[in-house]
Amino acid sequence: MARSKTSHNWLKEHFDDKYVKMAQKDGYRSRASYKLLEIQEKDKLIRPGMTVIDLGAAPGGWSQVTSRLIGGQGRLIASDILEMDSIPDVTFIQGDFTEDAILEQILEAVGNTQVDLVISDMAPNMSGLSAVDMPRAMFLCELALDLAGRVLRPGGDFLIKVFQGEGFDVYHKDIRKLFDKVQMRKPSSSRDRSREQYLLARGFRGIDGAASIERF
């Protein structure tokens, strides 16, 4: 009974959510589109002609926004473990980003192109146990940063969903070593109860031979 009540409350909150209604009206696949749109409005992160990688892309809300903003001269490579309906001119790679094979597919799709921006809305399936969820979340963050370090052009940017908790402070310090400017963003479309924030790092300095994160 309690579970049914909880499910009912979640569904009611979901369909009463103004951003869910806006997404349906505006033709976006998820309310997450408005998180990126709000950051874009403030920071002018995405520009026409850019090459962008979108991690944790499904169902495609961020890819829809990014594809529109980069235009026909831009290039977008998106990836997720889940299926995603196709979006015109978007290269989609389905698979588990923690696996080397998927990383290699992304790198192959990038080729010799230098990437202007890496964005990541990845999150693990949450158990509700911080001792379990935080290491999983931070591992995904570390892998996303590893990819950014491999593909970003000098001066490139990185936007990633993060969660406050164990491991975050060290991660934040690591990013500050690699980028000129690091800021935190909490879009109004992010639910108040959610611990998620977005870390925006601008002006990639380069790894300078620093060791990549070991993938396993």
Curated annotation (Swiss-Prot):
It catalyses: uridine(2552) in 23S rRNA + S-adenosyl-L-methionine = 2'-O-methyluridine(2552) in 23S rRNA + S-adenosyl-L-homocysteine + H(+). GO terms for molecular function: rRNA (uridine-2'-O-)-methyltransferase activity. It is found in: Cytoplasm. Keywords: Cytoplasm, Methyltransferase, rRNA processing, S-adenosyl-L-methionine, Transferase. GO terms for cellular component: cytoplasm. Its EC number is 2.1.1.166. The active site is at 161 (proton acceptor). InterPro entries: RNA_methyltr_RlmE, RNA_MeTrfase_FtsJ_dom, rRNA-MeTfrase_E, SAM-dependent_MTases_sf. Belongs to the class I-like SAM-binding methyltransferase superfamily. RNA methyltransferase RlmE family. This is Ribosomal RNA large subunit methyltransferase E. It comes from Pseudomonas syringae pv. syringae (strain B728a).
